[in-house]
Amino acid sequence: MLDSLKQKKNFKRIKMRIKTGDLVKVINGKEKGKTGEVLKTIPLENRVVVKGVNLRTKHVKPSQEGESGRILTEEASLHASNVMFFSKDKNLISKIEYFIDKEGVKKRRLKKTGELID
């Protein structure tokens, strides 16, 4: 799928404000209301994988004789527009904005409260 995306004429890599390790809350879809940590971001598809959210079961056949098959449960990706950054301290969701501090370092903060993220 990534190859087909790269071959499109107007293909653009989407810049994501959500990073790996951020705590997010699902705001849309069947998993709405759940919170979790971002395990992986996929910028080419504008998707994120969140720990404990959007679980899928995968049936794995035995690869060798004598080995039994398994049923694995793993997280599937969500579209990045369906999640928002979640502040555990204030217990609210907010958009993220970038700014440059006095030392000239680019940082992230919450738009609603101004709380620094990193």
Swiss-Prot record:
Q: Name one GO cellular component term.
A: ribonucleoprotein complex
Instruction: Enumerate the PROSITE patterns for this protein.
Output: RIBOSOMAL_L24
Keywords from the named record: Ribonucleoprotein, Ribosomal protein, RNA-binding, rRNA-binding
User: What's an example of a GO molecular-function annotation for this chain?
Assistant: rRNA binding
- InterPro entries for the chain: KOW (IPR005824), Rib_uL2_dom2 (IPR014722), Ribosomal_uL24 (IPR003256), Ribosomal_uL24_CS (IPR005825), Ribosomal_uL24_KOW (IPR041988), Translation_prot_SH3-like_sf (IPR008991)
Pfam families, from UniProt?
KOW, ribosomal_L24
Which residues lie in coiled coils? Answer: none
A single GO BP term for this record reads:
translation
Instruction: Please verify whether the record's keywords include Transport.
Output: no
- Disulphide bond pairs: none
Q: What does this protein do?
A: One of two assembly initiator proteins, it binds directly to the 5'-end of the 23S rRNA, where it nucleates assembly of the 50S subunit. One of the proteins that surrounds the polypeptide exit tunnel on the outside of the subunit.
Q: Which family does it belong to?
A: Belongs to the universal ribosomal protein uL24 family.
The record's subunit annotation is: Part of the 50S ribosomal subunit.
**NCBIfam families according to UniProt:** rplX_bact
HAMAP family xref list:
Ribosomal_uL24_B
Q: What is this protein called?
A: Large ribosomal subunit protein uL24
